[in-house]
Structure formats: C-alpha cells, structure tokens
Amino acid sequence: MFFKKYFLKEKIKQNSYFIWNNENKNIQIIKKFKLLDLDLIIGVDSQKEILLKNTINFAKGNFSNNALLWGARGNGKSSLIKSVFHNVLSKNKNLKLIQLNKNNMFDIEYIYSILGQYEEYRFIIFIDDLSFEKIDSDYKIIKST
C-alpha cells in the first residue's frame, strides 16, 4: 500500500492531465493532451471570461462555482475547458485536471477520497459528454457529493 500511495503522489506531483481508469481504480497520465490556444476560441467571449475567472479563483483556493457547459455536440465545450485549464495552469502549478467518463460517475466518491489526501493540489474533475435523458438518474450521484 505504501508503494502505491508513494507512486500516486509522484505521478500527481509530476503531471497535470489525468484520466480515471475504471479497471484499476486509479488515475492514468494523459501524455498527449490536445489543446487549442484560448485566443482561437471565438464566439463565446463572455462564457470564456467567466470560466477563466472562476478557474483562477478555484486554483487560488478562493470562492468558485462548479461549471456546467451545455450545447450541441462539436461546439467546443471540451476545447474551452482544456484551454482555460492550460491557461490557468501556467501560473498555478497546483492545478490538476482529471477526466472522468460518464460511465464512471459511480466512482466519484472513491475518487474524492483519493484526491482528498493531496490537499496541496486543486483538482478539476471534468466529465465529458455528459447528457441527461428523462429516464437517466445517474447524474444524481454528483448532486449529492
């Protein structure tokens, strides 16, 4: 157990982009992270500014809100999140991003318990392609955590 915790600590310390691996219940490093320059994302200037300020506040430990971006598929929501994160990361090395697939939302409490051991870092959990259907109640797990 000591070695697992030590290696996880080193992995978190040395990297910033991760994805949750449901099979081994651990985070995996994302080595190639597709990024757009924040200035190339156009047409959503007010949303970009709000998300940027909120992420800066979060990285500094100040008041911030959870963020939910919605819109049609392919409109750049994921690109905006990744670009804002990368922009804020350049000045706040304590910031980390963990991508979580919708199918792994039930692991969120377990993920929180792991990340809670690393108080020196600020973790953004990014759930990509989250959709809500009338018969889908899976999202309720994130409401209560």
State where each predicted segment sits.
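A conserved segment at the C-terminal end of the G1
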Residues: 82-86
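Pre-Walker A adenine-sensing motif
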Residues: 46-60
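Dynamic helix-loop-helix/coil hinge segments at AAA+ ATPase domain boundaries and subdomain interfaces
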Residues: 26-50
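Substrate-gripping "pore-loop 1 plus following alpha2 helix"
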Residues: 136-145
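AAA+/P-loop NTPase substrate/partner-engagement loops
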Residues: 41, 87-122, 129-135
